[in-house]
Amino acid sequence: MQRLLTPVKRILQLTRAVQETSLTPARLLPVAHQRFSTASAVPLAKTDTWPKDVGILALEVYFPAQYVDQTDLEKYNNVEAGKYTVGLGQTRMGFCSVQEDINSLCLTVVQRLMERIQLPWDSVGRLEVGTETIIDKSKAVKTVLMELFQDSGNTDIEGIDTTNACYGGTASLFNAANWMESSSWDGRYAMVVCGDIAVYPSGNARPTGGAGAVAMLIGPKAPLALERGLRGTHMENVYDFYKPNLASEYPIVDGKLSIQCYLRALDRCYTSYRKKIQNQWKQAGSDRPFTLDDLQYMIFHTPFCKMVQKSLARLMFNDFLSASSDTQTSLYKGLEAFGGLKLEDTYTNKDLDKALLKASQDMFDKKTKASLYLSTHNGNMYTSSLYGCLASLLSHHSAQELAGSRIGAFSYGSGLAASFFSFRVSQDAAPGSPLDKLVSSTSDLPKRLASRKCVSPEEFTEIMNQREQFYHKVNFSPPGDTNSLFPGTWYLERVDEQHRRKYARRPV
């Protein structure tokens, strides 16, 4: 009967549900975790106006409880010191044992978010999962997550899995916002879940792995609002990174090509975004160019941290080429010699790279460096990487520092699909405001990362070998001690003879 209620009655129900303590989930996180933001009730969906400020109300990040130190890995792999820590910009890499898979990661992050904000399970009307970690060619991760909603009786939840390399989470976010701004919206929240396990065979690519998941609650009047009409997208057919071997977790990667594809997509998405925002400004009576100065912060999909620094420098080069000769000389000192170049001719120009990195260093430190905290200490989370960067940015700034700012975001998925978009941060940073609660909810990120167990390269390699051994195996229970997992973590308990997976949760 729930789905047959009028929108007004439905909203009144949700309002009461959030307010009544009797509807608080029975299994809550420890008291220390209950200080995080509780989203307000969703306003009524109207047919004559857009819901205002649709965006991120709350988010949760999950990463595995163990990591391998990249300095130790350099020694173990007999490579020069600094190859991973300096060349890639990585210090630690989180990873999953056989006990965790993409379903368990997503189960964990969704339940952690719902319990922390104490949201009734029937207040979610859309849930979509972005992932490229495929363990079943038919059954979606979303269907497994429906187990969490069973006790509430809420089966009326739209959305399913979205897959294209590291882009699925962003596609899911856009779909959630589009749903909320459409006639299909029933007044409830949307949830976006993105997660992946990034693993590679032994060799040069293995240190660029990682694992994790992010869940985001989407709704109107959000402290991080998606800016409407401001998405620059580029898509094309290319084989830079792909996974055609369904018997293996490992991808086929053309590293040099993938970097060029990433930068080319960045150029084109940024160009499209600039045109759209400049058109909006022109319609509002302001005819001026958009530059990086109009972004207070900038986050990127992060395959490895050095790639991000190079990408911000690339955006500066776009601004440089678009500027007048006088502006080039006055604002972009050290780049004058590159003024006659075309973007498409510069992807392998090392002299330009060095000049750009030097010229953009201060901008990188101010706009982007803080967003790389999780990536530096956990590695590449594929489709959740960009949103891990968002959480890192929030964890390293106060609500007052963020208030009123614009956060640029670049999402890239090999194959390829890419978008450049932006969030507008709420002006209200008062204690107890939605922005203050959202920022506070990320404040324990450094502490949580520090609480993980450091595993030797030898043990890490053995666990990677186990993942190969048990991949698509049937009739087994994963090896390992569940006490090594964080409290409240879901894990794979058993795979039966028909490939059916059973999960359990470590007590909170």
From Swiss-Prot:
It is an enzyme of class 2 (transferase). It catalyses: acetoacetyl-CoA + acetyl-CoA + H2O = (3S)-3-hydroxy-3-methylglutaryl-CoA + CoA + H(+). Pathway: Metabolic intermediate biosynthesis; (R)-mevalonate biosynthesis; (R)-mevalonate from acetyl-CoA: step 2/3. Its main location: mitochondrion. (3S)-3-hydroxy-3-methylglutaryl-CoA binds at E80, A81, C166, N204, T208, S258, H301, K310, N380, S414. The modification Phosphoserine is found at S433, S440, S456, S477. The modification N6-succinyllysine is found at K52, K83, K221, K256, K310, K333, K342, K350, K354, K358, K447, K473. The active site is at E132, C166, H301. Gene3D superfamilies: 3.40.47.10. GO terms for biological process: acetyl-CoA metabolic process; adipose tissue development; cellular response to amino acid stimulus; cellular response to fatty acid; cellular response to glucocorticoid stimulus; cellular response to insulin stimulus; cellular response to lipopolysaccharide; cholesterol biosynthetic process. Changing V144L: In HMGCS2D; decreased protein abundance; stong reduction of enzymatic activity. Keywords: Acetylation, Cholesterol biosynthesis, Cholesterol metabolism, Disease variant, Lipid biosynthesis, Lipid metabolism, Mitochondrion, Phosphoprotein, Steroid biosynthesis, Steroid metabolism, Sterol biosynthesis, Sterol metabolism, Transferase, Transit peptide. InterPro entries: HMG_CoA_synt_AS, HMG_CoA_synt_C_dom, HMG_CoA_synth_N, HMG_CoA_synthase_euk, Thiolase-like. Changing R188H: In HMGCS2D; abolished protein expression. Changing F174L: In HMGCS2D; reduced peptide level; strong reduction of enzymatic activity. Changing G232V: In HMGCS2D; decreased protein abundance; abolished enzymatic activity. Residues 1-37 form a transit peptide. Catalyzes the first irreversible step in ketogenesis, condensing acetyl-CoA to acetoacetyl-CoA to form HMG-CoA, which is converted by HMG-CoA reductase (HMGCR) into mevalonate. Belongs to the thiolase-like superfamily. HMG-CoA synthase family. This is Hydroxymethylglutaryl-CoA synthase, mitochondrial. It comes from Homo sapiens. The gene is HMGCS2.
